[in-house]
């Protein structure tokens, strides 16, 4: 079979290895290739312009590639990673799948839930960790998948047993073109889910037509306190605060519902679940606090790549003066809602990256103190010169990092290095 993999990344490379083992003819197409060549694994790689849909029997698209891309438009047999994997399931092996999506919190919640479900041999994958084809080859029985809006957009058949949607705020508008498309992508899976499946959804979307028309069973939530009350857990029983408390509460809710489906009693598992969850360590670059050599508090929230994540970070330090490093690739999002919230804070901005002058213009409009630093190191230097012991220095950029860094991780690591440098 002639297979075209659109995009040359972790997901498609894993698929390429699987197809190669099964004696298929595999070609990769990617904008980053300027001419044809063989990569280090011996795969044939071509520039996107060389793709011929008449010379291909199956195309699987890397989720980061937009539906407006010429490769996607030309493809005649386009299938998502999720739908292809779904086509492999049979009577011999079909895993139980829990999907977690949302603008923010999905990585943390996926990691928390996977840990809670360890006794059921749960493994995480999708957007984090392992590509789905590798989970399939390992025959892992329970998949907890962090699922992006990109993957959901392209998927037309596959659905999970439980779908958790944590939140939806403006993000990835360059890819989706507008917020309505982004919202519809996040909700699309509900059109595929049958009566035997369960969707756990934000209350504010209860009246949305897609949700109203979905056959799936539904649970709606609003605040973490309400979720914990439903589970008969006092809010002080968990050691998390702010957005992380909601992540933890939702992980427990999904766990409770999974146990219910398995005809197991929540009360038999509750105390152990709380103990394990309270031992969970939040990942790097997510509200990660550290102190400089003078004992002043700095916070690495480099993973805050959108407005909502930054707003959640600010709430944690509501009563302190905040020196906020903001900027990067804002992905077509209007930052005005963020600036409207700044009036509730004592805040000084340090603008970096490709959106620095957009931030400066908004700061002037909203009368917020702002220095255009462009470079992260310059922003750190400026803050170092004025930061007092009772103030907070916060990197929570509300933007992706790829205009200046290889990833949000590199941005966070460099931030810490600049702070700790003499």
Swiss-Prot record:
- Family named by the database record: Belongs to the MurCDEF family.
GO aspect biological process, one term: peptidoglycan biosynthetic process
Q: What is the lineage of its organism?
A: Bacteria, Pseudomonadati, Campylobacterota, Epsilonproteobacteria, Campylobacterales
Tell me which residues bind ATP: 102-108
- Coiled-coil spans are none
Task: Report the EC code(s) recorded for this entry.
Answer: 6.3.2.9
Reaction catalysed by this enzyme: UDP-N-acetyl-alpha-D-muramoyl-L-alanine + D-glutamate + ATP = UDP-N-acetyl-alpha-D-muramoyl-L-alanyl-D-glutamate + ADP + phosphate + H(+)
Q: Which UniProt keywords apply?
A: ATP-binding, Cell cycle, Cell division, Cell shape, Cell wall biogenesis/degradation, Cytoplasm, Ligase, Nucleotide-binding, Peptidoglycan synthesis
Write out the function statement from the record: Cell wall formation. Catalyzes the addition of glutamate to the nucleotide precursor UDP-N-acetylmuramoyl-L-alanine (UMA).
Q: Where in the cell is it found?
A: Cytoplasm
The pathway to which it is assigned is: Cell wall biogenesis; peptidoglycan biosynthesis
Give any GO molecular function from the UniProt entry.
Answer: UDP-N-acetylmuramoylalanine-D-glutamate ligase activity
Q: Is Ligase found in the keyword set?
A: yes
Which top EC class is named for this enzyme in its record? ligase
| Entry-linked NCBIfam families | murD
Q: Name where it mostly resides.
A: cytoplasm
Protein name, as recorded: UDP-N-acetylmuramoylalanine--D-glutamate ligase
GO CC term, one of those recorded: cytoplasm
Q: Which InterPro entries match?
A: Folylpolyglutamate_synth_CS, Mur-like_cat_sf, Mur_ligase_C_dom_sf, Mur_ligase_cen, MurD
């Amino acid at each position: 079979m002639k297979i075209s993999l659109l995009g040359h990344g972790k997901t498609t490379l894993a698929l390429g290895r699987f197809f190669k083992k099964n004696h298929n003819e595999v070609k990769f197409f990617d904008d980053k290739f300027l001419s044809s060549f063989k990569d280090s694994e011996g795969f044939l790689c071509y520039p996107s312009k060389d793709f011929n849909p008449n010379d291909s029997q199956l195309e699987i698209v890397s989720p980061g590639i937009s539906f407006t891309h010429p490769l996607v438009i030309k493809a005649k047999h386009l299938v998502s990673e999720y739908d292809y994997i779904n086509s492999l399931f049979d009577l011999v092996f079909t895993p139980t799948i829990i999907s977690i999506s949302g603008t923010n919190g999905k990585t943390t919640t996926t990691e928390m839930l996977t840990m809670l479900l360890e006794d059921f041999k749960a493994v995480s994958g999708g957007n984090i960790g392992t590509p789905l084809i590798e989970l399939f080859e390992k025959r892992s029985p329970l998949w907890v998948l962090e699922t992006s809006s990109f993957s959901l957009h392209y998927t037309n058949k596959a659905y999970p047993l439980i779908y958790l949607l944590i939140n939806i705020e403006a993000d990835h508008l360059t890819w989706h073109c507008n917020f309505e498309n982004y919202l519809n992508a996040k909700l699309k899976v509900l059109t595929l889910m049958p009566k035997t499946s369960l969707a756990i959804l934000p209350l504010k979307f209860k009246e949305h037509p897609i949700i109203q028309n979905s056959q799936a069973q539904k649970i709606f939530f609003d605040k973490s306190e309400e979720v914990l009350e439903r589970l008969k857990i006092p809010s002080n029983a968990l050691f998390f605060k702010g957005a992380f408390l909601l992540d933890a509460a939702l992980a427990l809710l999904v766990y409770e519902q999974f146990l219910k489906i398995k005809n197991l009693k929540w009360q038999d598992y509750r105390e152990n679940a709380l103990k394990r969850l309270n031992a969970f360590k939040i990942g790097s670059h997510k509200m990660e606090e550290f102190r400089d050599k003078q004992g002043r508090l700095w916070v690495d929230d480099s993973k805050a790549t959108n407005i909502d994540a930054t707003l959640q970070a600010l709430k944690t330090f509501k009563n302190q003066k905040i020196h906020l490093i903001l900027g990067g690739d804002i992905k077509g999002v209007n930052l005005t809602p963020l600036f409207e919230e700044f009036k509730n804070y004592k805040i000084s901005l340090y603008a970096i990256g490709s959106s620095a002058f957009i931030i400066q213009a908004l700061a002037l409009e909203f009368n917020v103190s702002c220095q255009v630093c462009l470079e992260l190191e310059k922003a750190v230097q400026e803050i170092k010169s004025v930061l007092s012991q009772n103030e907070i220095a916060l990197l929570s950029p509300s933007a992706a990092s790829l205009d200046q860094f290889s990833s949000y991780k590199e941005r966070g690591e460099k931030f810490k290095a600049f702070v700790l440098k003499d």
